[in-house]
Amino acid sequence: MEYRLFDLHCDTPYRLHKEDKTLRTNDLHVALDKINYLSRYVQIAAIWSDYDLSDEEAYVAFWRVLNRFKREIESNRQRAAICRSYDEFAQLPENVAAFFLAVEDARILSGNVERIRELYDAGVRFLSLNWMGENALGGGYDTNAPLTHLGRTVVRMAFDLGITMDVSHSSAKVIDEIAEMAADLKKPIIATHSNANSVAVHPRNLTDTQFTKIKQSGGIVGISLAKEHLCGKSKPIAAVEDIIDHIEYYLGLDGQYTVCLGCDFDGIEITPESIDSVADLYKLADAMSAKNFSDELIHAIFYQNALNFLKKL
């Protein structure tokens, strides 16, 4: 089987900066030397900021992390590139890894909505309003808070600029409100790393209704490899079978064109059994094949669904 991967979420830029590691080779979950078995690799790379920083300090830290990541890309320009659009991606040789930039937690705007234009100009194409708790824009998954007036302004500006909203860390009210705004503007929304709440109950996981709203918007949903999202507290470590359970559940919601992978590599501490890094994801594909998933469906979940979404942006 030929392996291709379009993964919707990793936190590698932050880890590279914080731990002073290289993108080419490291002991993290994502490194260029760990993707040699993939004939194509596309990654949405999120930039997150420490929660012991103020919003303004987090904004400054964002640029440090981004600039470090860009230097890593430049140091490996024969093997990796940052893309801003499908057209830029399509021009890359297949052996060049493509990274798209995301911001995880828009608190870095620090109340200045014009900063979203700076993020767009810097290459950011995906944005989540929260990581946890409440901020000036609205509520995270662990709250019941809705969008604030400022949050609605930011969402509208993001849509107008061409930044896709990621609702993975949003409260139920925020998800509903962003979905409503997206429907009015005929824009898709995504959940880059959110599993099925009906399989494993967790406030970060999606209800059937939330998944359906994302699907109906034309968006996609990535399967997270975080243990708590896969199996809750039912066991100390998740198995590949737990990943497949969430995939199968989403497929049962008519999600064959919606479900993708959003592994959350370098953002999770405990990976599923036998999957230590991106280098091991072929084991998931092989396990799916052993459960009679067609090669076409495996390819769709690993790569094609996300690529088709990218083409529409």
What do these predicted ranges mean?
Residues 3-7, 42, 98-102, 125-126, ...:
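Structural preference for beta-strand elements that scaffold enzyme active sites
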Residues 9-13, 48-50, 85, 102-106, ...:
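Active-site beta-loop-alpha junctions enriched in small/polar residues
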Residues 20-37, 283-285:
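Short catalytic helix/loop segments, enriched in acidic residues and glycine
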Residues 36-113, 136-152, 156-157, 167, ...:
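A metal-dependent hydrolase metal-coordination microenvironment
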Residues 111-121, 125, 142-190, 203-217, ...:
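Histidine/acidic residue-rich metal-binding segments in metalloenzymes
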Residues 276-313:
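Mid-to-C-terminal alpha-helical segments outside catalytic/metal-binding sites
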